[in-house]
Curated annotation (Swiss-Prot):
Compartments, record wording: Cytoplasm
Protein family (similarity comment): Belongs to the MurCDEF family.
Annotated protein name in UniProt: UDP-N-acetylmuramate--L-alanine ligase
Top-level taxonomy: Bacteria, Pseudomonadati, Pseudomonadota, Alphaproteobacteria, Hyphomicrobiales
GO terms of molecular function: ATP binding; UDP-N-acetylmuramate-L-alanine ligase activity
Role description: Cell wall formation.
Gene: murC
């Protein structure tokens, strides 16, 4: 049964969040009456208002108005005044993933999960399906540059969504195709143990219907181990691994583009199909891997090589994924969301592939608990940066933890052998260092999930002043 149009006003608490805003936008496009609130004005709130969606700034009981349904994310606390008011009025309170699941019932769906790479892979799947004329509906965890938004309503039969595993609610999503990019020990505050994370991803794949499939990256040992435990669902594997059903090889850089080949082997017939010299306008093996996942999905949906080739070549990227924010004296400045050691290592490796110059990495650790739990990994993930500048921890509402700090991370980086790791107290220290240390052809890469993105956009202007 599809969600009826008669459910009344749907109120989103935290409507400006990247996940919530996309769902609200698609609901509105489908003709539902949508409104919401957020703590602060942001670009997502502005965009929703421009589409005719009422968005309050600040949380208050009276914001609910005539709401009949309230949607919340896991970030909303039980003492939030709108949550309290909804409880008092006995309104249905719906989790973000549950509302996303309701939207997915309108279409056949591809859900992209994994610890890293979800947003980019979701965008790539959408790009290929677009190029193949399938006109998908898309709900993503990041702004897709070609759309200028994280969500769009398509006229086709398919929906492409990012499946956020952070609170376990991704298991509610009724996907026909489930993609897993990788599995690392993240969100242990919710799951309690890595074994429970593994089990959640197994269930994610086994939740697809018998006519669906899992698309899984066997370059990652945890995912390869999971493949052997999937007993009753069809699986297509991908990666650089020689055993992959959809395998990329011969990856190289040409004029800032990744160029690579893809070999597709059918399990039943052992037939082989090769696509040579595919071009992706972004660097990095991890991005080629994500593109291979998208190719695996597109191939399963019957798309031809020409459409795949066209979709990859035209891929416009995702905001905050190695996004160029400006240049100064031949120095390129990038903004990236990477805040986990695996992501940081992949981004810096991609930067190293893309330039023969020096790389200055500017990192803002995100959450004290993450820095504590992955301290050794953070101490070893900056090897591809010539200089590392570490800013104070972005707490994201957490309290400090004794002995866990950016200064401690810098000391650990130096102890592990990094030749130029420094602590910086804030953004005001960056421009003088870049002026002194950087030369034409160098990259400056900002890394983090906090407000460091504002620094990345401010630096080009500061350098020019």
């Amino acid at each position: 049964m599809k969600m009826p149009q008669t459910i009344g006003v749907v109120h989103f608490v935290g409507i400006g969040g990247i996940g919530m805003s996309g769902i609200a936008e698609v609901l509105h496009t489908l003709g539902y009456h949508v409104q919401g609130s957020d703590q602060a004005e942001n670009a997502n709130v502005v965009r929703l208002r421009e589409k005719g969606i009422k968005a309050f700034i600040g949380h208050a009981a009276e914001n609910l108005g005539d709401a009949e349904v309230v949607v919340i994310s896991s970030a909303i606390k039980r003492d939030n005044p709108e949550y309290v008011a909804a409880r008092e009025r006995h309104l249905p309170i719906v989790r973000r993933a549950e509302m996303l699941a309701e939207l997915m019932r309108f279409r056949q769906a591809v859900a992209i999960g994994g610890t890293h790479g979800k947003t980019t892979t979701t965008s790539m799947v959408a790009a290929l399906l677009d190029a193949g004329g399938l006109d998908p509906t898309v709900i993503n965890g990041g702004i897709i540059n070609v759309y200028g938004t994280n969500a769009r309503m398509g006229e086709g039969d398919w929906m492409v969504v990012e499946a956020d595993e952070s609170d376990g609610t991704f298991l509610k999503l009724p996907a026909d195709i489930a993609v897993i990019t990788n599995i690392d020990p993240e969100h242990l505050d919710h799951y309690g143990s890595f074994d429970k994370v593994r089990e959640a991803f197994r269930q994610f794949v086994e939740n697809v219907p018998f006519y669906g499939l899992g698309v899984m990256c066997i370059d990652h040992p945890e995912v390869q181990a999971l493949v052997s435990r999937i007993e009753d669902r069809r699986v297509v594997t991908y990666g650089e691994n020689l055993q992959a059903d959809v395998r990329f090889e011969n990856h190289r850089m040409e004029n800032g583009h990744s160029v690579f080949d893809v070999i597709i082997r059918a399990r039943k017939s052992d037939a082989v199909k090769a696509m040579r010299d595919l071009r992706l306008p972004m660097p990095g093996r991890h991005n080629v891997s994500n593109a291979t996942a998208a190719i695996a999905v597109a191939n399963e949906l019957g798309m031809g090589e020409e459409a795949i080739r066209k979709g990859l070549a035209a891929f416009g990227g995702v905001k905050r994924r190695f996004t160029l924010t400006g240049t100064w004296n031949g120095i390129s400045i990038f903004d990236d969301y990477g805040h986990h050691p695996v992501e940081i290592r992949a981004v810096l490796k991609a930067a190293r592939e893309a330039t023969s110059g020096r790389i200055i990495a500017i990192a803002q650790p995100h959450r004290y608990t993450r820095l504590r739990d992955l301290f050794d990994e953070f101490s070893a993930c900056f090897n591809d940066a010539d200089t590392v500048l570490v800013a104070p921890v972005y707490a994201a509402g957490e309290s400090p933890i004794a002995g866990i700090s950016s200064e401690a991370l810098v000391a650990s980086l130096r102890a592990a052998g990094h030749r130029d790791a420094r602590f910086i107290p804030g953004p005001e220290a960056i421009a003088p260092i870049v002026r002194e240390a950087a030369n034409e052809g160098d990259f400056v890469v900002f890394l983090g999930a906090g407000n460091i993105t504002q620094w990345a956009y401010a630096l080009p202007k500061e350098l020019c002043s």
